[in-house]
């Protein structure tokens, strides 16, 4: 090809391309005369699209041809305009959208297996939260955003992190992470491999890693606040969280964010990219990449000398005695004892995609997947020279030894993926899918020693880790058999595998690596199980106002057998849709997780000249058998909900729901069992089993949880030239209590011990807020948006015997109510660039606690100022955890944080 020919070809191509796309349509989209921003304008069949700017304007260049222009937005009825473009056309299409009584984002999938319904028409309480609402919180992760938007949802960082730095426990209605089922696009998400063992809410349980889901990948969240075991199987006693991923592509988005606390630490950095494409008539791909870094924020307190001497010195001697003077001299130089307690350092990379490929007129092949890689580093308590020696390994020879600070490092990977095919033939809708998922965690402990090994000890250890995987097959069918009657049925087959990975020998030999002992080789194991379940669901609109829904489900597990559950729900509308009365009754179950069945974490020590084991023993161990501890069986629940919804106008809504959840055979992680009397039956059993102390999982209690949820929204309020929406939602716990006495095995009961001491009972029943209320206002005017949100955290209580001793049998540590206020300001710099600034905890409110006596003995202690001060010191580990105490509170200890975000759309 000659140079001239190439030049001619390029000129022709440029001219032809210019002619091909020189046609244009533009216009303005309004609602009741006001500009409608963020409306999707999609061209079919090409799939090309834009969104309207803050003035409601749009513009698209198109080739010659005939097109359908679809205008759609949340809360509005779709409008479709047909346009024919010839060479050089420039056409204007203005559209005024009408408000829809039923927007697409009000359609909820969760809660029914036969027919999706609007949240207003559902017989069940469902929260429907869009991605924008999550982003205005300014929180870095999905789970923390929910904390400040959903009253019945709770999660918080624990001050003593270790493995929980990788993911924090969460729960709905104070029932722990293992009783909330997490779905992604309606498919079960894998559990984490981490079993929470610290004395914080969620102890002895595991849940999914919510922080693994990129916020920019989320279209909306559906939270069903009702038991749903009949629809979905195990783990849905408290409710179901369904994460709906973005699907139809609207625009690409690049978001840069950075933040810092008011103390100048805890810096955060993030980059998120979301994009995709539309193809064919219904095809789409939407994908997200998210990278973030969170630095350490230190909130250590000053050490109280009196408590420190009582812990590490000799309180019977004066401060001038050699032992006590060493402590006093050290704290004079290092008042915080060199501690770096606070949040850990976390680096994360997250990826997600959602794909749909049309197959024929009604078929759709779909696939979605997510992957996250996280690395976390947290600091253990610093070991001052008067607490621990380092055998000369952690400080240079000839220098003064001041102690050492162990660090914990964790590497986490979490993944999930689904492929499936949906189709409709003669009104029968079918969905067949395969889902895989997994979570693995490997740990390292550095800058510490194994004191048993002395000078031969390494200073870095690999303590092992955990892994969990599942493979799930689903087949679901539904049909509207009659105009007012629909059915759904299906099956699920699930296989789960849980692995415990041993650490290196030095990490567990003797007392193990100081601060985080490793997993012993004999405790490492790989175990699997499978289950198959089938359900039948029917929904009957008896008339236009009266709905009745019922579901039954049968499950079979390879390790414990069968489970049968059912659910009925109903809804009655009065005065059209203005007043809705709804209710449900159901039974549920939760299978013990493989973590609870097989986890064993023990350490050895010399007792009476022989080796004795202490720690967590699984229920299949000979030690548990000797104590008469039975194998775990499923929890059983009875759920009841009754509520009403009031919708006087399309802009005003109010719902109130009462719930009651009774859980029988609830699985708990026991107290530490020991015996001071070797001649007792308990003492003999422990001695014969070679056990010093033992803990285990057991179907130990029956619990009753009752409460109220309310939600109120008022939107589209005209204020000046802008519009405002206000919301108020709350959760109030009427009762969260243990019914009757714990199911103590005979040997333990006769030995004067119990599986649940006061501390564990307190943790289960009163360590989450008694109430939580979230209120806010959202105002938009032209390019400016302002969101003000306040969260009232109610009182929590805790009886910390581990740190406070026996005095805490008569005294409670009470965290007082507090309001945390968040402010988010957004501004559209241009049509495609938005700047957002968030101040979380605007007034720098910190958790505050005090001691309250529950009887005369407790009041006697509190009336003695010396005893009271000493007790307060013990609860905060001599002041190391001055803000939270050793075991956490209702909300973050970081105080005010600032977050800035810059978003580009293209």
Regions found by a protein language model. Give the residues of each.
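C-terminal beta-signal and adjacent terminal beta-strands/loops
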Residues: 192, 734, 792-802, 827-906
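Short, acidic, small-residue-rich periplasmic hinge/interaction motif at the N-terminus
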Residues: 28-34, 38-44, 72-76, 86, ...
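Outer-membrane beta-barrel transmembrane domain signature of Gram-negative proteins
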Residues: 396-398, 404-426, 434-438, 448-547, ...
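Short, acidic Ser/Thr/Gly-rich low-complexity loop/linker segments typical of extracellular
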Residues: 47-57
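N-terminal periplasmic accessory domains that precede
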Residues: 90-96, 142-145, 149, 170, ...
